């Protein structure tokens, strides 16, 4: 168990990356440019990849299961020798191999799809958690599933309903590989027409040509960038929370127009998600202290008390 104090920098952790796209876009070749990869081939397509790496050709879930020696904690499995584990494809791994495996364990699950998917989810999570605990980055490759919605074609990873939901939940990043003006492009940003997940807020990236020096470690660099972004996001959130706490403390002590205007300038630097709520709170609490905002100058000033004549007029 790791204990992380609020003022400590978040440690880098292994990530889960999902890549999907049409045939021929080089999904497997790109994934194999990750650091020290092992490819678990469940789709019989490893020999088409431009970038050849060490490969397990799995025929059933037990091949993957036994490769890691999940049932034997004393002996390290083959997977332990690698930094990145690539599963190609996730659909065959989950919908075919793992589904058949849980039915083999309990034949009643063959006719009970709800419980079968529940058992599949438990087995899959256990496998993923062991890999993550061992510090392995994981890449799941999927085909592109196109669905027609009127004149619009929508794209999503090809995986059966609940298996896809499980994959999307555990993934840190989901990227779509496609051709754009003859060049291969990778985008993690979700749109109206395609599924994506962009935790690290990476821009759309042009994939380098195979054989170039940039392509050789392309996926390794992406994974490094994602890890750094997740780590820095945690640090940024910590700094944002600290800034809000300090602003609230100053608001409690704020009694003068000068202090109010200084606090207003600080409020402009708060994180956008918290800025509006704090400004509304500031206006309300300062008004109770006799300090209000001039609508013309947008500055705080002393709330003038009405004269006796004005009171009579009212």
Please provide the spans of the model-predicted regions.
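P-loop NTPase motor core
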Residues: 91-165
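Interfaces that engage single-stranded nucleic acids at replication/repair/recombination sites
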Residues: 6, 25, 34, 38, ...
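Short, well-ordered beta-strand core segments
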Residues: 37-39, 138, 174-176
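Short, conserved beta-strand edge motifs with alternating hydrophobic and charged residues
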Residues: 86, 139-143, 176-177
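Conserved GTP-binding G-domain of TRAFAC-class P-loop NTPases and closely related GTPase folds
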Residues: 147-246
């Amino acid at each position: 168990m790791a204990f992380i104090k609020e003022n400590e920098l978040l440690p880098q952790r292994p990530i889960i990356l999902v890549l999907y796209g049409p045939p021929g876009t080089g999904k497997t070749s790109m994934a194999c440019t990750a650091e020290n990869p092992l490819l678990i081939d469940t789709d019989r397509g490893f020999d088409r990849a431009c970038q050849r790496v060490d490969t397990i050709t799995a025929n059933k879930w037990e091949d993957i299961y036994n490769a890691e020696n999940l049932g034997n904690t004393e002996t390290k499995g083959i997977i332990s020798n690698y930094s990145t584990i690539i599963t190609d494809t996730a659909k065959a791994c989950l919908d075919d191999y793992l589904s058949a495996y849980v039915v083999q364990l309990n034949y009643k699950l063959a006719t009970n799809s709800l419980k079968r998917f529940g058992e599949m989810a438990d087995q899959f999570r256990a496998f993923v958690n062991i890999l993550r605990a061992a510090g392995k980055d994981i890449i799941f490759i999927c085909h592109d599933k196109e669905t027609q919605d009127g004149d619009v074609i929508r794209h999503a990873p090809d995986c059966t309903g609940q298996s896809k939901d499980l994959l999307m939940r555990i993934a840190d990043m989901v990227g779509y590989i496609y051709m754009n003006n003859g060049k291969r492009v990778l985008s993690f940003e979700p749109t109206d027409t395609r599924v994506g997940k962009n935790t690290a807020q990476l821009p759309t990236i042009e994939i380098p040509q195979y054989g170039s020096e940039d392509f050789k470690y392309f996926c390794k660099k992406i994974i490094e960038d994602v890890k750094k972004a997740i780590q820095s996001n945690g640090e940024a959130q910590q700094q944002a929370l600290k800034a809000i706490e300090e602003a609230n403390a100053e608001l409690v002590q704020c009694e003068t127009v000068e202090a109010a205007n200084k606090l207003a300038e600080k409020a402009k630097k708060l994180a956008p998600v918290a800025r509006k709520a704090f400004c509304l709170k500031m206006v309300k609490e300062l008004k109770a202290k006799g300090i209000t905002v001039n609508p013309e100058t947008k500055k705080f000033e002393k709330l003038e008390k009405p004269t006796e004549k004005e009171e009579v007029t009212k």
